[in-house]
């Protein structure tokens, strides 16, 4: 068992190196700079070694996206747990979501706009995605007729705001007002 455990740890360490390198390159130069060849050069492995861990580039992006979902879950949980008022908790979550998208553009892109092999809203949806969605759902008022649809609408609106802000279509300076209006319009 000792050799198998060691090999498993080494495999996991290589996968972490691959995803860390992909994320670092994407954050510095954009996702177009992330290729299997470039990653292999960065971490000093051959391309076949990378392919032994990940089927293709989309799978690497998907692994980075899973990291992002773990991170955003924690960020949203902290935002939801601060205020005692449910409306303030929803606004806090909305602002935390928008801040996350702004502070981690390459990671956010991997999570929501890049091609990956991740399944959303299906039986095979990874736990990281479901758990992040559940944090959003936890701040949706239980009085909503369909909490899942309300959560999807909240998420879609936040994503739209994040994308518009990222592309410079709307001003960053009015985000607090937009978050308050969104929460008020959807849930009150």
What are the functions of these language-model segments?
Residues 1-29, 36-38, 42, 59-62:
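Basic, helix-initiating cap at the start of DNA-binding domains
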Residues 18-26, 68, 72, 97, ...:
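Short hydrophobic clusters on alpha-helical segments that form packing/core surfaces
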Residues 26, 61-68, 111-115, 124, ...:
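Alpha-helical DNA-contacting segments of helix-turn-helix folds
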Residues 44-54:
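Short hydrophobic/aromatic patch on the recognition helix
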Residues 118-144, 148-153, 177-187:
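Amphipathic alpha-helical packing segments from all-alpha helical-bundle domains
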Residues 156-173, 186-188:
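Amphipathic C-terminal alpha-helical segment
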């Amino acid at each position: 068992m000792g050799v198998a455990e060691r090999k498993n740890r080494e495999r996991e360490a290589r996968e972490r190196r691959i995803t860390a390198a992909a994320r670092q390159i994407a954050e510095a130069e954009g996702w177009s700079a992330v290729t299997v060849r470039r990653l292999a050069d960065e971490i000093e492995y051959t391309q076949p070694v990378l392919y032994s861990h990940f089927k293709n580039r989309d799978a690497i992006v998907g692994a980075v996206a899973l990291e992002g979902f773990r991170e955003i879950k924690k960020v949203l949980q902290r935002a939801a747990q601060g205020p005692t008022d449910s409306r303030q908790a929803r606004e806090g979550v909305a602002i935390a979501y928008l801040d996350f998208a702004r502070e981690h553009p390459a990671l956010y892109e991997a999570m929501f706009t890049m091609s990956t092999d991740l399944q959303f809203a299906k039986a095979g949806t990874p736990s990281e995605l479901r758990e992040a969605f559940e944090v959003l759902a936890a701040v949706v008022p239980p009085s909503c007729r369909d909490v899942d649809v309300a959560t999807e609408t909240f998420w879609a609106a936040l994503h739209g705001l994040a994308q518009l802000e990222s592309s410079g279509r709307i001003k960053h300076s009015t985000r607090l007002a937009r978050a308050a209006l969104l929460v008020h319009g959807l849930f009150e």
